[in-house]
Amino acid sequence: MNISKLPPLSPSVIRRILFYLLMLLFCQQLAMIFWRVGLPDNSPVASVQITPAQARQQPVTLNDFTLFGVSPEKNRSGALDASQMSNLPPSTLNLSLTGVMVGDDTARSIAIISKDNEQFSRGVNEEVPGYNAKIVSIRPDKVVLQYQGRYEVLGLYNQEENSADGVSGAQLNEQLQQRASTTMSDYVSFSPVMNDNKLHGYRLNPGPKSDSFYRVGLQDNDMAVALNGLDLRDEEQAKKAMERMADVHNFTLTVERDGQRQDIYMEFGGDE
């Protein structure tokens, strides 16, 4: 069929063809509008969040395995029961205990230790001078040390008792009496008073030799705020005061009673 021989389309035919095409497009648009408006909205599809399962067990590390077993848990407080205390050997360290200050709060207790004619004040969990030994407990008449993996006892009279060899009984007895007569704790008991973790002074009470305590004018539960000019409310100055007590035989206590302060002079070391 030869297209060139077809008769040309008249303008009326062309207009008619264009009209039908426009009508077809119009009907298509109407159908799409009806489809969107007439039908209900699709319900949202519930989303499911998938997360990997969490491990319920702790991961195993190399530190969990030991070649020789696990050592027992350390006693952080340093407290030992009565049976352990009674079986502890005396310390072999070249130290002497010259005084102790024990309060209700064991963490605030102070031990005064002498080494090479020097005085040091140490508390619980602190190392003693000259040795890799730590204080784990402070008692009224002794301290317990931890040295090279074992516990040892350093008593107030260790030095005299250990030097008994070559000393006569009379000389040893004289040394012990002299030591006992110059121990400040025989006259006054100091107990630190804490408030909001701050040192407010030391509560005073009579020691075994209570006559001297009351004779100088002290009363039960007096609050000491200074000793020989050192502020007992400052922990560093309080430690210095405790260190010096072993070398002095008289001191001035500043006590606070009923809101008033007064200085009380006390001398010890002689026969009471």
Swiss-Prot record:
**Cystines in this chain:** none
Tagged with keyword Transmembrane helix: yes
**What coarse category fits the chief subcellular location reported for this protein?**
membrane
Show the taxonomic lineage.
Bacteria, Pseudomonadati, Pseudomonadota, Gammaproteobacteria, Enterobacterales
Q: Where in the cell is it found?
A: Cell inner membrane
Show which residues sit on the Periplasmic side of the membrane.
36-272
Q: What does this protein do?
A: Involved in a type II secretion system (T2SS, formerly general secretion pathway, GSP) for the export of proteins. Required for the translocation of the multiple pectic enzymes.
Write down the NCBIfam families for this protein, in alphabetical order: typeII_sec_gspC (TIGR01713)
Organism (species): Dickeya chrysanthemi
One GO location term (cellular component): plasma membrane
> Per its record, how is this protein called by name?
Type II secretion system protein C
Q: Which Pfam families match?
A: T2SSC
UniProt entry keywords in alphabetical sequence: Cell inner membrane, Cell membrane, Membrane, Protein transport, Transmembrane, Transmembrane helix, Transport
**GO annotations under biological process?**
protein secretion by the type II secretion system
Q: What family does this belong to?
A: Belongs to the GSP C family.
**Hey, which stretches end up on the Cytoplasmic side?**
1-16
Q: Which residues cross the membrane?
A: 17-35
